[in-house]
UniProtKB/Swiss-Prot annotation:
One of its GO terms (cellular component) is small ribosomal subunit. Coiled coil: none annotated. This is Small ribosomal subunit protein uS14. PANTHER family: 30S RIBOSOMAL PROTEIN S14, SMALL RIBOSOMAL SUBUNIT PROTEIN US14M. InterPro entries: Ribosomal_uS14, Ribosomal_uS14_bac/plastid. Part of the 30S ribosomal subunit. Contacts proteins S3 and S10. Keywords: Ribonucleoprotein, Ribosomal protein, RNA-binding, rRNA-binding. HAMAP family: Ribosomal_uS14_1 (MF_00537). It comes from Rhodopseudomonas palustris (strain TIE-1). Gene3D superfamilies: 1.10.287.1480. Residues 1-23 are annotated as: Disordered.
Length: 101
């Protein structure tokens, strides 16, 4: 089980990213638009740099919904390999059977 503080920190980052996404997209569009004057694009770059780092989507870590484990998390169901194995061995994942040959 991951530390509760790490899980909460990641949840705060998710919330902050969601709130700041429109503003970030607007600023990035201004920066990428070559028809705008250089001063305006530079000002947009400075505004983007002033935004909190945690509002960037790259700071979000994929974590297991059950355990909070940060590594080996499948995006499809947001569970770690260990959680999938545990649920599968208890028969809680439909269609998942233990392999034998």
């Amino acid at each position: 089980m991951a530390k509760k503080s790490a899980i909460e920190k990641n949840n705060r980052r998710k919330k902050m990213t969601k709130n700041a996404a429109p503003k970030r997209a607007r600023l990035k569009a201004i920066i990428a638009d070559k028809s705008k004057p250089m001063e305006e694009r530079f000002a947009a770059t400075l505004k983007l740099a002033e935004m909190p780092r945690n509002s960037s989507a790259t700071r979000i870590r994929n974590r297991c919904d059950l355990t909070g484990r940060p590594r080996s998390v499948y995006r499809l169901n947001k569970l770690s390999r260990i959680a999938i194995r545990d649920l599968g061995s208890r028969g809680l994942v439909p269609g998942l059977v233990k392999s034998s040959w």
